[in-house]
Swiss-Prot record:
It catalyses: shikimate + ATP = 3-phosphoshikimate + ADP + H(+). Monomer. It is an enzyme of class 2 (transferase). HAMAP family: Shikimate_kinase. This is Shikimate kinase. InterPro entries: P-loop_NTPase (IPR027417), Shikimate/glucono_kinase (IPR031322), Shikimate_kinase/TSH1 (IPR000623), Shikimate_kinase_CS (IPR023000). GO terms for molecular function: ATP binding; magnesium ion binding; shikimate kinase activity. GO terms for biological process: amino acid biosynthetic process; aromatic amino acid family biosynthetic process; chorismate biosynthetic process. Its main location: cytoplasm. One of its GO terms (cellular component) is cytosol. The gene is aroK.
Length: 211
């Protein structure tokens, strides 16, 4: 079964550049991490504060296909979904001045990891599995978590994906239990620091979490 595609890019509301907290953060900001790590919540707030456009790749896939993620998994399987995800990702990263929230499994393909690093500053939102479970265990829109033991599945996925997130990221931030606004303010500081170090050193640094 093939879903319809609509290639008009979906945008968030016009960025709030008047009250922007950007200082100087050029280019795209790409958020990676496990499901439940806060990519969408953080991404929307960050985009508003730094005057960029927010795009959620899962929402874009659903908009283009006209169906929810669980339906794609049911009909095409995870492999079919990953193929669509990669296609949409290639389209989106060509956009300028965006904050992109990726899907949790977007980093599974090596080409995707290279693409993300090439087209923006990649930020890994890292949260403990216990916190991920608290945020996701009632969510029926996550096909990989429709299992009898959500905690065990999250451990399995985290074990598989954490090294790939770390390999891909320029910045790693702990997105555990703190307010979204406090987290985003810390992230903006890290992004400014990262940009300064990139300018001086000529290559993106990997900033490890200090708290």
């Amino acid at each position: 079964m093939h879903f319809r595609y609509n290639y008009r890019m979906q945008r968030s509301k016009t960025p709030n550049t008047k009250n922007s907290d950007t200082g100087s953060i050029p280019g795209n900001i790409i958020l990676i991490g496990m499901m439940g790590s806060g990519k969408t919540t953080v991404g929307k707030l960050l985009a508003n504060l730094v005057g960029k456009t927010f795009i959620d790749i899962d929402h874009e896939i659903q908009r283009r296909t006209g169906v929810g993620i669980p339906v794609i998994f049911e009909i095409e399987g995870e492999a079919g979904f990953r193929k669509r995800e990669s296609e949409v990702l290639r389209d989106i990263v060509r956009q300028q001045n965006i904050v992109l929230a990726t899907g949790g499994g977007a980093i599974l393909h090596p080409d995707n990891r290279a693409l993300l690093r090439q087209h923006g500053t990649v930020v890994y939102l890292c949260a403990p599995v216990t916190e991920l479970r608290r945020r996701t265990y009632l969510d029926k829109n996550r096909p990989l978590l429709q299992t009898g033991n959500v905690h065990a599945k999250l451990i399995e996925l985290f074990t598989q994906r954490d090294p790939l997130y770390r390999e891909t990221a320029h910045i790693i931030m702990d997105s555990g239990r703190q307010s979204a606004r406090a987290f985003v303010q810390k992230l903006i500081q890290k992004l400014r620091q990262s940009n300064q170090e990139f300018t001086a050193a000529g290559s993106p640094p990997c900033v490890k979490p200090s708290e």
